[in-house]
Amino acid sequence: MNKQIQTEADELGFFGEYGGQYVPETLMPAIIELKKAYKEAKADPEFQRELEYYLSEYVGRTTPLTYAASYTESLGGAKIYLKREDLNHTGAHKINNALGQALLAKRMGKKKLVAETGAGQHGVASATVAALFDMELVVFMGSEDIKRQQLNVFRMELLGAKVVAVEDGQGTLSDAVNKALQYWVSHVDDTHYLLGSALGPDPFPTIVRDFQSVIGKEIKSQILKKEGRLPDAIVACIGGGSNAIGTFYPFIKDDVALYGVEAAGQGEDTDKHALAIGKGSPGVLHGTKMYLIQDEGGQVQLAHSISAGLDYPGIGPEHSYYHDIGRVTFENASDTQAMNALINFTKHEGTIPAIESAHALSYVERLAPTMSKEDIIVVTISGRGDKDMETIRQYMAERGLAND
């Protein structure tokens, strides 16, 4: 494995040609302050101890790495292990990062938080830590996503957050990020922007990756204990890329195949997809250079996915770099493929995954049968499907699948 891979952003915040700090001058002092504070916190054993305490006692880590016996047998190939991020408090991987950033904000003396959310999982995780640490929180959420995720909106409000509907654009995650950044610019003195994915201006991609890499670190020690070796392949779904980068990062320099699964929406040959790598090109959005779905004129296009957490038109800078150097292979799953995998997996394993995670499972169902029974695949179940029950029910009813 090539040991020359760049695994940290350079001084200007770039991974290869991706990343950077494309923000208005007014935000630069806050970005510089954040970078300095994070560097100090990262090197402070007391901060790390506090983070570990809350991850263990509040979030419920370590999450299990479960051998999926029935699923493995049904696919007839490689052994499949599930990294159970769905078992975290709040039901997804998002809490790992929300908790870390809230502790960082507290350390910086910030009393208020602002966040964006798509599926509502990052919003719920942010509202949870805001309640825990007695901080105010404003969450921006696209109006379209609010319709899809009523239950999560109620959860956030119950936890004390103020949820603001974003009507601009398509009313989804990308528009919510725009609004959250604008809000941060005008409230920068007392507010920390709790960004939920591995994107945005440097140092956000690094901060989010570091707080999420607990996933991959745990996988590494767990699989060595269970199998005495590293897996042959690791699979994770990709929207902005936080669960995937957290899963992959500890394995970047190991001889392990890494697969990121993007949302192909209604299909690669339509314009209703979220294939930033598959059909995009490099561009700048939300403060960073990364792969984006855009037209020839550089206009960012609307992303589509049945999963509210994957309909983002970009993919974080570190993933963009790993794609260019060939370290991570990007595959995709359509809405239909993801939903079929969700139904199949649930019937075999008794676990209802989030629709996001089902995109990764769809690729596992294609990959596993091509591998030998001695091979090992680890797939990250990034979240549980509770938030998606209405979407799943509707999908199955429309197709007459309800009683299959």
From Swiss-Prot:
Name it: Tryptophan synthase beta chain
Record Gene3D superfamilies: 3.40.50.1100
The catalysed reaction is:
(1S,2R)-1-C-(indol-3-yl)glycerol 3-phosphate + L-serine = D-glyceraldehyde 3-phosphate + L-tryptophan + H2O
Q: Which residues form the signal peptide?
A: none
Cofactor(s) demanded: pyridoxal 5'-phosphate
Query: From which lineage does this chain's organism come?
Result: Bacteria, Bacillati, Bacillota, Bacilli, Bacillales
Positions of transmembrane segments: none
Kindly state the subunit structure of this protein.
Tetramer of two alpha and two beta chains.
InterPro entries membership: Trp_synth_b_CS, Trp_synth_beta, Trp_synth_beta/beta-like, TrpB-like_PALP, TrpB-like_PALP_sf
Modified positions (N6-(pyridoxal phosphate)lysine) in chain numbering: K94
Q: What is its EC number?
A: 4.2.1.20
Instruction: Show the GO MF annotations.
Output: tryptophan synthase activity
Q: What does this protein do?
A: The beta subunit is responsible for the synthesis of L-tryptophan from indole and L-serine.
Alphabetical keyword list: Amino-acid biosynthesis, Aromatic amino acid biosynthesis, Lyase, Pyridoxal phosphate, Tryptophan biosynthesis
The organism named in the record is Staphylococcus aureus (strain bovine RF122 / ET3-1)
